[in-house]
């Protein structure tokens, strides 16, 4: 019985998501920017926000106290409904961000295509577990919406980190910028800045809390970088991937 409920909700969520996605003019514009080679990771975050918004709308319409048995999101239902649609968001967003990275690499004469990160299955399981603990699903709706958005935006963060690691290992000098959103919390403001990437750096700058809209960019800058531990600004010139 509950399996039938899961499949009915999943099919309805997927149908509504596909409808929203296919008719979106904003998505069409963002995909066009990939085709024309104009896309940046700012577009990756815009794309992620649209995708998360579509999924949240589909979930809100089809996963309710009326469609769930006893008004509760049991774990196996969460696993059968939320896990596949979250994984779909990850695929859509990381593929978009990968294509953006390919464009950026080409502009910097880097002969490597962008890469996609592995899905973080533990985070998906964590979301399923968190929202299946509530006795009344409707009381958790806002939190679930925030988690869907956070997870989808983090797919961009993870893609950028994956590519920064890859290029750094090849000897390219990667610089990471984190921009705090207007009105950001104290924690996010403390992370705002430009950082010289290294394999041993603190990767907290790639993390985000619920409802965080901060963005992360990667580039190959000259003349300035910020040490991730001391946050002091150094002036200099890059030569062979090192500051002189």
Where are these regions (language model features)?
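Domain-core detector
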Residues: 1-209, 217-244
């Amino acid at each position: 019985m509950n399996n039938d409920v899961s499949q009915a909700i999943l099919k309805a969520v997927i149908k509504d998501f596909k409808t929203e996605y296919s008719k979106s003019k904003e998505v069409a514009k963002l995909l066009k920017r990939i085709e024309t080679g104009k896309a940046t990771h700012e577009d990756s975050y815009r794309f992620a926000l649209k995708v998360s918004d579509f999924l949240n709308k589909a979930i809100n319409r089809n996963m309710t106290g009326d469609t769930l048995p006893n008004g509760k999101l049991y774990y196996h239902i969460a696993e059968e409904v939320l896990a596949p649609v979250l994984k779909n968001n990850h695929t859509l967003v990381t593929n978009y961000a990968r294509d953006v990275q390919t464009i950026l690499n080409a502009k910097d004469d880097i002969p490597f295509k962008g890469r996609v990160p592995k899905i973080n299955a533990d985070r998906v399981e964590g979301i399923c577990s968190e929202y299946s603990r509530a006795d009344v699903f409707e009381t958790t709706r806002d939190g679930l919406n925030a988690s869907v958005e956070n997870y989808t935006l983090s797919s961009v963060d993870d893609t950028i980190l994956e590519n920064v690691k890859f290029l750094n290992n090849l000897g390219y000098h990667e610089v990471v910028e984190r921009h705090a959103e207007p009105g950001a919390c104290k924690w996010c403001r403390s992370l705002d800045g430009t950082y010289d990437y290294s394999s041993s750096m603190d990767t907290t700058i790639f993390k985000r809390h619920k409802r965080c809209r901060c963005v992360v960019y990667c580039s190959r800058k000259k003349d300035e970088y910020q040490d991730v531990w001391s946050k002091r600004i150094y002036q200099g010139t890059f030569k062979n991937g090192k500051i002189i």
